[in-house]
């Protein structure tokens, strides 16, 4: 039987240093956060919490500064993500904007869209949602029949 083996690795010192900062922030910010809310962190929307993450530079972390990002490493972003999820923090409000819509705007959006929207995402001010279901397909994106058609208008 084949198996995969991964050697343990260490994160760079700047990423591990960030871990302590994130844990301290979460301990303080979430001290009175009820366990029932923590259990629903994926659907929990807490605008104040999202804005606090944005103020610390923990949203849009890897994005260019010209669009409100912070040009941090993917490993630093990983540390923040790991700690926020482990704490049961409310990520539902900013998750799609920070991890899906924002990167898509950076890659495919117009300059005006990047300037107008991305900085607000990085500040935790915008909440996005995505619809990925229709009758007879559920969340199976490959079976969705709805299509977008570009027009001159």
Which residues are covered by each model-predicted region?
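Short hydrophobic motif
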Residues: 15, 22, 26-27, 53
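Glycine-rich flavin
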Residues: 31-153
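Short alpha-helical hairpin
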Residues: 1, 27-31
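Intrinsic disorder at enzyme termini
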Residues: 1-19
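Solvent-exposed alpha-helix faces
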Residues: 20-23, 85
């Amino acid at each position: 039987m084949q198996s995969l083996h991964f050697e343990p690795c260490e994160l760079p010192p700047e990423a591990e240093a960030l871990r302590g900062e994130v844990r301290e922030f979460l301990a303080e910010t979430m001290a009175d956060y009820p366990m029932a809310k923590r259990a629903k962190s994926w659907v929990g929307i807490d605008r104040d919490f999202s804005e606090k993450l944005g103020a610390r530079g923990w949203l849009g972390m890897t994005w260019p500064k010209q669009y409100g990002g912070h040009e941090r490493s993917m490993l630093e972003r990983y540390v923040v993500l790991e700690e926020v999820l482990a704490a049961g923090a409310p990520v539902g409000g900013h998750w799609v904007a920070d991890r899906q819509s924002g990167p898509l705007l950076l890659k495919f959006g117009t300059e005006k869209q990047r300037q107008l929207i991305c900085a607000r995402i990085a500040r935790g001010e915008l909440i996005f949602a995505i619809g990925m279901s229709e009758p007879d397909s559920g969340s199976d994106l490959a079976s969705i029949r709805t299509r977008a058609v570009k027009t001159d208008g």
